[in-house]
Amino acid sequence: MTQSYFELFGLEAKFKIDLAKLENNFRKIQSESHPDRFVTAAAAKKLKSMQLATLANEAYQTLKQPANRAKYLLELQGVEAIAETNTSMPADFLMQQMEWREAIDDAKNAKDIAALDNLLITMQRESDELNTELSLLIDNNHDYPAATNTTRKLIFIDKVCIDIKKVIEKLEDSN
């Protein structure tokens, strides 16, 4: 059996994790598997250390981001959070998405960085609420279908935050 990303870092397979422990264990694995430590080692040992370093990096990137961590946890439960065939979202969330996109466009057209900053704060609050919800749904209730919808919302929020930051950066660069 293959080791899960959580096991690799000595963490319990939960949504709410100790990020400091994740960081420390990642750095420890990276240090132990660094290529400089295997300069004189046999080719097989070099390859194994490189594979471990690559796995640790992939696992770390997955677990440090809440949306990726939720998606991975759902996959461990046999649930595909981002299925090509499952793109439905609640109507109220779809309406909210359109309102957020309009607000971004309006602020961009008005070159209103303050409005974009406020929208970013709103999105971060929404993200925090979804993270709390995911912790309850996954860790406490084991309600994976509901966690799937919440994960998809969080992925959308993350994308919107990235888009807002890009717009802010462009506006700041043009000033």
What are these language model-derived features?
Residues 1-175:
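C-terminal accessory/regulatory regions appended to core domains
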